[in-house]
């Protein structure tokens, strides 16, 4: 934490916390709990953060206290983050062409560089591919771009399907993928919007445009 916030005293005081990548804050439970529950104090740096378990957006610059069950994790995600995730069916990354779910945490624009290799040897330093992911919010328009894949590795898939999941979202007025009207699903219990990008060439850029009735949907 103190590498990212060297001038904040809390970064030194909360010694068990750490960042996983640029946008995920983890606060492990390190003390015994009672009857399957543990109370954890977490320091949230300045900015907006989403609690992973509940999807609640919290203001940073303060300490929060929360009780977690054994099957819950004190994990917080920075607002604006894009997190790519594989499905539950992935057994290994070699020649993996499974769908990738891009989960967006609203609160501003965000970027992510998706790195992939064959996951089966030591050539990862020289043989790999990257896909640039970007989300931009401008008024009532949210634009998500899946960039052209660059680089190469043995066995990489030529095509892939992506899905975009926007958390804390209202139902949209319209959705397009590469300029064409697209189907979408609204998960009312999660307040989340899901847009599927058809399986396409990984060397081609894909652009999702989500337009809302209201500019203030975050």
Language-model features, listed with the residues they occupy:
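Surface-exposed interaction regions enriched in Ser/Thr/Asp/Glu
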Residues: 198-218
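A short amphipathic beta-strand at an alpha->beta junction
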Residues: 170-179, 204-211
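Surface-exposed loop/edge segments in extracytoplasmic proteins
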Residues: 57-59, 173-176, 180-184
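Extracellular/luminal ectodomains and secreted, surface-exposed scaffolds of diverse proteins
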Residues: 178-203
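Catalytic core of carbohydrate-active enzymes
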Residues: 1-143, 147-172
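Short beta-strand element of the conserved SAM-dependent methyltransferase core
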Residues: 76-78, 133, 184, 207-212
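Exposed regions on extracellular, virion, or secretory-pathway luminal proteins
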Residues: 75, 177-180, 215-217
